[in-house]
Swiss-Prot record:
Keywords: Cytoplasm, DNA recombination. May be involved in recombination. It is found in: Cytoplasm, Nucleoid. PANTHER family: RECOMBINATION-ASSOCIATED PROTEIN RDGC. It comes from Pseudomonas aeruginosa (strain ATCC 15692 / DSM 22644 / CIP 104116 / JCM 14847 / LMG 12228 / 1C / PRS 101 / PAO1). InterPro entries: RdgC. Belongs to the RdgC family. Its main location: cytoplasm. This is Recombination-associated protein RdgC. GO terms for cellular component: bacterial nucleoid; cytoplasm. One of its GO terms (molecular function) is double-stranded DNA binding. One of its GO terms (biological process) is regulation of DNA recombination. The gene is rdgC.
């Protein structure tokens, strides 16, 4: 159980949670299949295991792992448009009259309702870790929309959820640009070989570099010309590597082999034990990594009144 992406949210108040109350709350918002006329459903599922008895909350030390599933019927717009055009053409030809917007919209709704039961279903899951002792919720996603879907559903389940995206005092682009310009990152962080450079003008250019020496003259010339680093690949303390963007999204997380081998050793031969060990080790690593990252980026910004 290793997260591949990371969006970090700060709890703005103490969250009094225990496994039983969280399990009960999530049960009120459990995932279910789409009914024949439903476009989408969203709810919580067991992060580990299957079946109705699998718990919706996995607890390890003082960390809670949860998972949400979105189920949606895929109805391509082109299919609806083609069916609507065919119906409109048929009415206009048979009844010798024009079909106007109000009737056209009604026909479209009828077509959607007819096609929905036969539409393909797509399912996707999003994992999150709640760490009350750290005051954080960590979502395994690079999409703010997916993270907000999970958090808003969790808020509905709990009744309230005092949380906000974590922010830092210094603009991330300024720090990342400085690291590439000076060829040195702060603390135990090391610049790797990938970055994205953007012009400061609204319609300015974008340069994406992969497997490239970021200390090269070419990169430095872009920085001298005023481009800013908006995405940068980094390594931390020989434990993990990742790509950080200007919104503080951590992408393409990769945990080093030593950590994964340790989790395999701790988990034993049982599949659930392996998942639990990897989740625990991941969260203990995050407990060190995230404070170090935000300190290196200038320190966490605490909004006034919070």
């Amino acid at each position: 159980m290793w997260f591949r992406n990371l969006l970090v949210y700060r709890l703005t108040q103490d969250l009094q949670l225990d496994a039983d109350s969280l399990e009960k709350a999530l049960g009120e918002k459990s995932a279910r299949p789409c009914a024949s006329q439903e476009l989408t459903t969203y709810g919580f599922t067991a992060p580990f295991g299957k079946g109705p008895d699998a718990p919706l909350v996995h607890v390890s030390q003082d960390f809670f792992l949860i998972s949400a599933r979105k189920e949606e019927r895929i109805l391509p717009g082109s299919v609806v448009r083609d069916a609507l055009k065919e119906k409109v053409d048929e009415i206009e030809a048979q009844q010798m009259r024009k079909v106007y917007k109000k009737e056209r919209d009604q026909l479209k709704d009828e077509i959607v309702q007819t096609l929905l039961p036969r539409a393909f279903i797509r399912r996707s899951s999003t994992f999150a870790a709640i760490a009350p002792s750290l005051g954080l919720i960590l979502v395994d996603s690079a999409s703010a929309k997916k993270a907000e879907d999970l958090l808003s559903t969790l808020r509905e389940a709990l009744g309230s959820l005092p949380v906000r995206p974590l922010s830092v005092k210094v603009a991330p682009t300024a720090t990342l640009t400085d690291w590439v310009k000076t060829q040195e990152a702060a603390g135990d962080f090391h610049v790797l070989d990938e970055c994205e450079l953007r012009d400061t003008h609204e319609d300015g250019g974008v340069v994406r570099c992969k497997r490239q020496d970021l200390t090269s003259e070419e990169i430095q010339l872009h920085l001298t010309a005023g481009k800013l680093v908006t995405q940068l690949s980094l390594a931390w303390s020989d434990k993990l590597s990742f790509v950080l963007d200007d919104k503080l999204a951590v992408k393409r997380l990769r945990f080093e082999d030593l950590l994964q081998e340790q989790a395999e050793k701790d988990g034993g031969e049982d599949a659930l034990g392996q998942l639990d060990a990897s989740f625990t080790l991941m969260m203990l690593t995050f407990a060190e990594f995230l404070p170090a990252l935000f300190e290196a980026l200038g320190g966490e910004e605490i909004p006034q009144g919070v």
